[in-house]
């Protein structure tokens, strides 16, 4: 924030900002990850984590441990921290924090609908949902047969309701339509969040708009690569891209006609901020692209802590915790499956 906004920031939000900056110091370091990567079994992983801020959440877990247990308990810490922030927050910070959870809501909706389509048990699916994206009527998603029913029966009373305006059709729910729904919802959500941050102004708008633009560009690349070789038309692909970001609009026009990964690479290398990402990847491969994007995201998230008096630190902290949990899930899976030679493949160091 700038000028007079800076003078009043601490009155309402200074305490929470200090809490978040303090919590950030509890994120795992490169030394922690190196120790975790040397573990022989999941009990060793638990032993190392009990010496960190995850200790109280894991110390009473009996053996034998499972990867899902470790991830669940580490996620519980993130949820507790988020709830603490929400309890202390006043407007407009409380609305900003709610926006952060909408992405998880979308993922949960897609998880339930996809699982139901493949005749999975609803209770089993609910256990896999992210706790930050839960809402009261989520179990009722299983009864919907098409987008219109999904909206009318369940989602009309949730924060996702405004994002469904472009999704409401009478087409039956199948795998392709569900993925289109996910990306259409994400597009509407990111555009709405972007506009909200613009209204907040100051450093919050400056930093958050940059972070959200990066997210929109990453999603555009992923949509393009994942739709290569499918029946999705160029026009349909173009409609799924968010209407902001560094790639908007000319990069989107080029991505919409790409037919292989190397063509996507050719488009992205025209944009200097993304050249370093694709320089890490060999021609013709996309397996390591996710890690390269995550590394760039972590770099940008860490930079947001260099300024004060803005809300982006709350977004950045939650995203960094989520990345840390992804790291722990990967390490735990590699240890559990005795694949220690691959343990560094997907770990993204934060510090």
Swiss-Prot record:
GO molecular function ontology, one term from the record: proton-transporting ATPase activity, rotational mechanism
Disulphide connectivity of cysteines: none
SUPFAM superfamilies from the UniProt entry: V-type ATP synthase subunit C
Superkingdom of origin organism: Eukaryota
Pfam families in the record: vATP-synt_AC39
Alphabetical keyword list: Hydrogen ion transport, Ion transport, Transport
Keyword hit for Ion transport: yes
GO terms classed as biological process: vacuolar acidification; vacuolar transport
GO cellular component: proton-transporting V-type ATPase, V0 domain; vacuolar proton-transporting V-type ATPase complex
Gene3D superfamilies associated with the record: ATP synthase (C/AC39) subunit, domain 3 (1.10.132.50), V-type ATP synthase subunit C domain (1.20.1690.10)
Function, as annotated: Subunit of the integral membrane V0 complex of vacuolar ATPase. Vacuolar ATPase is responsible for acidifying a variety of intracellular compartments in eukaryotic cells, thus providing most of the energy required for transport processes in the vacuolar system.
Complex formation: V-ATPase is a heteromultimeric enzyme composed of a peripheral catalytic V1 complex (components A to H) attached to an integral membrane V0 proton pore complex (components: a, c, c', c'' and d).
Similarity annotation: Belongs to the V-ATPase V0D/AC39 subunit family.
Protein name: Probable V-type proton ATPase subunit d
Species per Swiss-Prot/TrEMBL record: Oryza sativa subsp. japonica
């Amino acid at each position: 924030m700038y000028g007079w906004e800076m003078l009043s920031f601490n009155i309402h939000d200074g305490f929470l900002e200090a809490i978040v900056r303090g919590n950030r110091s509890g994120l795992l370091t490169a030394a922690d990850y190196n120790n975790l990567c040397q573990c022989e079994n999941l009990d060793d992983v638990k032993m190392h984590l009990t010496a960190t801020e995850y200790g109280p959440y894991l110390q009473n877990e009996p053996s034998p441990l499972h990867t899902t247990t470790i991830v669940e308990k580490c996620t519980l810490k993130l949820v507790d921290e988020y709830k603490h922030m929400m309890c202390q927050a006043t407007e407009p910070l409380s609305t900003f924090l709610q926006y952060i959870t909408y992405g998880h809501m979308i993922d949960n909706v897609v998880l339930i609908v996809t699982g139901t389509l493949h005749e999975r048990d609803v209770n089993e699916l609910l256990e896999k949902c992210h706790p930050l994206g839960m809402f009261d009527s989520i179990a009722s998603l299983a009864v919907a047969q098409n987008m219109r029913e999904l909206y009318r029966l369940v989602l009309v009373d949730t924060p996702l309701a405004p994002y469904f305006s472009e999704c409401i059709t009478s087409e039956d729910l199948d795998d392709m339509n569900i993925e289109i729904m996910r990306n259409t919802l994400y597009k509407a959500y990111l555009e709405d969040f972007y506009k909200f941050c613009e209204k907040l102004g100051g450093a919050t708008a400056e930093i958050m708009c940059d972070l959200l633009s990066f997210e929109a560009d990453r999603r555009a690349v992923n949509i393009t690569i994942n739709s290569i070789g499918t029946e999705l038309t160029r026009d349909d692909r173009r409609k799924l891209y968010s209407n902001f970001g560094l790639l908007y609009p000319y990069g989107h026009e080029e991505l919409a006609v790409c037919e292989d990964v190397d063509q996507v690479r050719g488009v992205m290398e025209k944009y200097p901020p993304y050249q370093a990402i694709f320089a890490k990847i060999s021609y013709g491969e996309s397996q390591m692209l996710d890690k390269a994007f995550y590394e760039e995201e972590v770099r940008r998230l860490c930079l947001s802590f260099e300024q004060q008096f803005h809300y982006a630190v709350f977004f950045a902290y939650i995203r960094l915790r989520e990345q840390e949990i992804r790291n722990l899930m990967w390490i735990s899976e590699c240890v559990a499956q005795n694949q220690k030679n691959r343990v560094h493949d997907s770990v993204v160091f934060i510090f």
